[in-house]
Every structure is written in C-alpha cells, then in structure tokens.
C-alpha cells in the first residue's frame, strides 16, 4: 500500500475551477464517507481531505487502482470531467506525497510563504477524517509527522518573518486607491477568520466607519463588537452597498452574493465615485463581471498573489533551511513506511514471528497441562515443555543449515551464528 496526495491548488488551477472543489469543513466527513462507499471494492483504503481557498487535496493510503477511482470521484463531485481535473491536478506518490504534505504544513506551498493558518486547517482535516472513520494508522502517521516537521520549521527558521498576509495586502491595495484610509467607509461581508483578520488591519487605519454583513446576525454582531462596527442584514446589502468605499467579502456561499446589477445601482447612487472591492472567497462572492465596470477596482484572492509574494526572495535562506528539515522528515517517514511493507517489511515479519511463537507456546502449554493432569512430575513436565519449545524454534533453522550448496550453507551459518549465538559471544567478551 502506497501513500498518495492528489488535488489542485493555486499554482495548478484557476480560481473558478478551484471554486468547484471548495468544501466547507462540515461537508468533509460526509464526503469522505461517500468516497469510502464508492471504494467498497478496495478495502482498507485510508483517506483524508484538505480544502481551503487555495487548494483541495485528498491524501490516501491505497493501491494505484483506488487512486484512479478517487480522481474520477473528485471530478464528479466538482461537476467536471476527469480529463479536465487531471489537466489541472497533481498526483504524488510515497516520498513525493510525504514531501508535499510536509511543505504544505510548513507553509512552503502556500500563496503567502510561511503562513501559519494552513497548519490549523490540516489539523481540522485530520479530525474530519477521524470523524468519518477513514483515517487509518498510515495517514495518521503522515499527518503527525507533518505537524512535527512544521513545528520544527517554524521554530528553527524565519520562514514566516516579514510575510504579508492577504489581509495586509488588501489594506495596501486600498491605500493605493484612496489617499487617506481614515476618510473611507469599509464593509465586511462574512464573519469568519479571514474577515476578522481583515477587519483588524483596516480598523488600525481608523476609517470613518466600519460595517459588517453576515447571514447569521448573532455571529456578525459578536465580531462587529470587537471593532465598533455596525451590523447589516445580508438581505439589506443591495440597498446599502452605495454607502461604502471599500467592500471586503469572504463567505462560504456556493453562489455569488453581490451581483453586477447591485454594484451598478450602487455606483449610480455614488455618482460613480470609485469602489474598492476584494473577493477573498472561493467560490466567488462577487460576480466576476463586476470587474469590467470602470469605477470598480475588484481584486480576487489570485490577484493578491503578487502583493503577498513581495519580499519572498529575501527569505530564500529560510526556505533552504526549511527544505533541509523536510528532507530529513521525508527520509524518516519513508523508513517507517518501508518497515511496514507487506513484502520485505520488518514490521509484518515481526508480527508473523510473534504469531508463530504464540502458536508454539499454546501447543506446549496444552501438552504440559495434560501431562500434569496425568500425574507426571512437575520437573519432568517443565523439562519437556522447554525441550518442545526449543525443538520447534530450531527445526526450521536446522533444516536451512543442511540445505543448499556449500556457499549458501556458509552464509546461512553466519546468519544463524549472529542471531542465536550473540549472547554467548557477548559473554565471552
């Protein structure tokens, strides 16, 4: 059984395609259970799913045939052809899959180099797989080692130093459009972690006003209270949109919530004063046609990439250090995996040896109990038990010593001496 990572990310797939595969956290466990049912002809497969704004990945411990099926299942889930998904996806096996997982956890594969949020998202993915009952010992080991590597990378390097977050990038872009951010009104749509971070950055600029719209009013009020923002109902957005100079949106909606018509009406009421809009959602919150409007400056999560990547060149030394830590982690994991390989692996052999010796032990114990029940002397019974175990353990070895040609017997003799006469050799020393 091999370890696999397959999926799409910001480097391989455009925003709209990624949007088809953006699954909310509470959707992941049910989808993994559905995947397991579709893999019923491949028993023992382990799976986990990571879904963020910038990537959707499935990690598997499985054979090749199960991976081919999984890619088709994922394509069907997103409503696209397998050929289209394959053209924009990657499928990585064993050491490449482990390296990818370690790089993702460490923030090296993120749009924002060194960002820490992905580590928490990976831990959420593990919990979802556990809830679905599809994680398994192999993937659990992969993820636990991913977390350990990520911790070492962050504590031993400066990979996250001086990075620019998406939220900070949004503020920087707004500053290029508006001369004074303290003279604008800002609307946030959504109440998740990304909106909270954006609100923190914009609030630091002391704008004229902050407002927040959310589908769940209570949750919106809780976040708004932290920044002194007013709260709007999501249904009121079309009629209130013109009041705001900047709109930052990031919800989990499967469909756009700010349409072209609403923005056109807002611009008319604003007498075509410019509007700054940032859509951090995947799939989109704001209809893409809005970008064509002359007085709107609309940025998506992909548009912010060039801003957040500023300064990454100066952190290449930290990247090199991180890659060295990851290299060591990959080697360690692959050694662990090889030991558990059914063909030639140490762990399966140890299990077989333990099972065989347990059969011998049980057989000799049963024989000893019968002898004791017949009134045999305990010393004689113990001697027979020990002799019986010794004969069973050495029978195969003795047969191998007599088999084969002279060279083979000599090699076998060296191995047997190393295994069975080690204690005697140490005693002689």
Curated annotation (Swiss-Prot):
Main function: Catalyzes the NADPH-dependent reduction of glutamyl-tRNA(Glu) to glutamate 1-semialdehyde (GSA).
Binding-site list for substrate: 52-55, 110, 115-117, 121
Pathway assigned to this chain's UniProt record: Porphyrin-containing compound metabolism; protoporphyrin-IX biosynthesis; 5-aminolevulinate from L-glutamyl-tRNA(Glu): step 1/2
HAMAP family reported in the protein's UniProt record: Glu_tRNA_reductase (MF_00087)
Record-marked site positions (Important for activity): 100
Listed transmembrane segments: none
Active site: 53
Keywords tagged on the record: NADP, Oxidoreductase, Porphyrin biosynthesis
Protein name according to UniProt: Glutamyl-tRNA reductase
EC numbers, comma separated: 1.2.1.70
Organism annotation: Verminephrobacter eiseniae (strain EF01-2)
BP-aspect Gene Ontology terms: protoporphyrinogen IX biosynthetic process from glutamate
Any one Gene Ontology molecular-function term assigned to this protein's record: NADP binding
Gene3D superfamilies (alphabetical): Glutamyl-tRNA reductase, N-terminal domain, NAD(P)-binding Rossmann-like Domain
């Amino acid at each position: 059984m091999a370890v696999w990572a397959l999926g799409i990310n910001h480097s391989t797939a455009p925003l709209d395609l990624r949007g088809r595969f953006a699954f909310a956290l509470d959707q992941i466990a049910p989808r993994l259970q559905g995947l397991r049912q579709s893999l019923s002809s491949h028993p023992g497969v382990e799976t986990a799913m990571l879904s963020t704004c910038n990537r959707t990945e499935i990690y598997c411990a499985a054979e090749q045939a199960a991976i081919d099926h999984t890619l088709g299942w994922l394509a069907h889930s997103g409503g696209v052809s397998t050929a289209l998904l394959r053209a924009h996806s990657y499928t990585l096996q064993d050491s490449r899959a482990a390296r990818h997982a370690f790089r993702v956890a460490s923030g090296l594969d993120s749009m924002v180099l060194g960002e820490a949020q992905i580590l928490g998202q990976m831990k959420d993915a593990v919990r979802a797989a556990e809830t679905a009952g599809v994680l398994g010992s192999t993937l659990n080991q992969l993820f636990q080692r991913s977390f350990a590597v990520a911790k070492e990378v962050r504590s031993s390097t400066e990979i996250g130093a001086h990075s620019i977050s998406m939220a900070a990038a949004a503020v920087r872009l707004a500053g290029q459009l508006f001369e004074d951010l303290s003279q604008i009104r800002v609307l946030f749509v959504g109440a998740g972690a990304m909106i909270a971070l954006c609100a923190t950055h914009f609030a630091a600029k002391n704008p004229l006003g902050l407002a927040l719209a959310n589908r769940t009013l209570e949750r919106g009020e809780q976040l708004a209270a932290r920044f002194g923002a007013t709260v709007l109902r999501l249904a009121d957005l079309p009629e209130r949109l013109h009041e705001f100079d900047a709109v930052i949106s990031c919800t989990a909606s499967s469909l756009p919530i700010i349409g072209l018509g609403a923005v056109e009406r807002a611009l008319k009421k604003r007498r075509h004063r410019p509007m700054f809009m940032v859509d951090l959602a995947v799939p989109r919150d704001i209809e893409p046609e809005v970008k064509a409007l002359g007085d709107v400056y609309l940025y998506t999560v992909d548009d912010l990439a060039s801003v957040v990547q500023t300064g990454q060149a100066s952190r290449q030394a930290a990247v090199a250090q991180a890659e060295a830590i990851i290299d060591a982690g990959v080697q360690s994991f692959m050694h662990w995996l090889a030991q558990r390989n059914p063909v030639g692996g140490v762990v399966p052999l140890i299990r077989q040896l333990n099972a065989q010796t347990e059969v011998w032990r049980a057989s000799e114990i049963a024989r000893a109990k019968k002898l004791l029940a017949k009134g045999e002397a305990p010393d004689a019974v113990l001697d027979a038990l020990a002799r019986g175990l010794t004969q069973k353990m050495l029978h195969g070895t003795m047969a191998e010593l007599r088999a084969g040609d002279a060279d083979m017997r000599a090699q076998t003799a060296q191995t047997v001496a190393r295994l069975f006469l080690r204690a005697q050799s140490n005693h002689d020393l």
